[in-house]
Amino acid sequence: ATPYSPAHWTSTHPVDSTLAYLQYTSGSTSAPKGVMVSHGNMTAQSRCITEAGCYDADSVTLSWMPHFHDYGLVKGIVQPAWIGRPAYLMSPLTFLKRPLRWLEAIQRYHVTHSGAPNFAYRRCVETIAAEDRARLDLSGWQVASCGAEPIAHDTIDRFAEAFAPAGFRREAFFPAYGMAEYTLLISLKRESVAPTVLSLDPATLERGVVSEAKAGIAPVRQVVGCGAPVGDTRVVIAHPETLSRCAVQQVGEIWLAGASTTQGYWNNPEETARTFGATLRDTGEGPFLRTGDLGFVRDGEVFVTGRLKDLLIVRGRNHYPQDIERTVEQSHRLCRGGGAAAFSVQD
């Protein structure tokens, strides 16, 4: 028998609980962990994305996100195959070397769905010259998803303004929230309306209370909404220490339940139990997936304010590192966007 003969093939007959692949986390806040994604997780997630992602018979996708990342794998490869629509793939290096190529490909191949992290839209604004923008036609770009890192309101504003002459609509921005432990997508803006941006009082936000800033008050903390939970996803905001449900208009840890919840971490039962086995102390409901993200839900929409492990406490006050980083980046023209990192040190 040859290595390719039927004698060397064993049919697996996978069921929903069968392990499909290991998706390693980014390692941005801890050592990378292998997330166990099942076939059932994949099908549940694909149904969620299909329902929420505004796909139709004319949809065409394009992705330059790396395939080892859940964004590039699920949205770039699995989802187009699931819905049976054309998909174009571009190397991440192609985008990084010349961001214009991404937008040129969207025009050339009549792409309707393509997304990227916040930094990519910012790079397009910063590096694509006005004469190049004038040659683009982005009127067919229906869903410009944005996720995988904090979404800055000024990035949305600047990109929408810069590429409006090319036919890009602000309503095409679809902010999203997701994580590997939930296969990928947790929430996504649905309707063809502009993204929700709340102007919050930073003083009350430090205390974990959501309060819109009064007119004329400065500075304000602007938070971009990430849409409604997809499919059967249930979002609960819980106090990270008491493990009880937070009151309305209170910031807490985002907990999840749904068919996209993965099976845990490969060969790491202790961390699996900590992360995937949470129960609400006041009601006994569970199990929930603890995301480690801080946020709140308002009018059915998820808002992410930061990472629990990243929160900086200085003289008893809570500071979100992304706020400090953004302030530093905007303080001088020599400060490169995405080039600052705020963290605490022991005295």
Where are these regions (language model features)?
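AMP-binding (ANL) adenylation modules
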Residues: 65-70, 259-260, 278-284, 294-297, ...
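Gly/Ser/Thr-rich phosphate-binding loop
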Residues: 111-115, 125-220, 234-236, 241-245
